[in-house]
């Protein structure tokens, strides 16, 4: 069987690939994840996903390498992972009662070519109270997640509805990713 590598240390992406019953290994890429303001959100996540995959694929050229990057976009503003609890609260206030998009760029590099795509999911939040925001932040859950929330955790209670791929919001559009890996011959 050809080697499949996830170029990410994200526990959520690992869990999703395990859900798909794929045999893979994890080799986190250590790249500068700075998003340049001149890029559109779509270009930024695609470029970061490619850089992550390329950093690993350069050392494993005969393997299939998956890189991914996820951001939350609200009114053309990219919301990455909050650096402080105050920043997390500000992000959640922004998203409260509003719709936003979750974008995941995926790069699959293989000996048979590559697949690069961006998946977009629209998420609608209920109005959040300050108590809900602070109780959620106190769990520590939002601190390692783009947009300061994890739809698969307690923040599921904030979500009114979504349009698109649920797993994309978690961190990897699973169905499309698996189909692309197989299309490339894995």
Swiss-Prot record:
Family stated for the protein in its record: Belongs to the Maf family. YhdE subfamily.
Catalyses which reaction(s): dTTP + H2O = dTMP + diphosphate + H(+); UTP + H2O = UMP + diphosphate + H(+)
GO CC terms: cytoplasm
Active site, renumbered: 69
Entry-linked NCBIfam families: maf
MF terms in GO: dTTP diphosphatase activity; UTP diphosphatase activity
GO terms classed as biological process: nucleotide metabolic process
UniProt-listed Pfam families: Maf
Organism: Geobacillus sp. (strain WCH70)
Swiss-Prot/TrEMBL cofactor(s): a divalent metal cation
Gene responsible for this protein: maf
Protein name: dTTP/UTP pyrophosphatase
Cellular localisation: Cytoplasm
Site feature location: Important for substrate specificity: 12, 70, 152
EC number, as in UniProt: 3.6.1.9
PANTHER family the record matches: BIFUNCTIONAL DTTP/UTP PYROPHOSPHATASE/METHYLTRANSFERASE PROTEIN-RELATED (PTHR43213), BIFUNCTIONAL DTTP_UTP PYROPHOSPHATASE_METHYLTRANSFERASE PROTEIN-RELATED (PTHR43213:SF5)
CDD domains assigned: Maf
Keywords: Cytoplasm, Hydrolase, Nucleotide metabolism
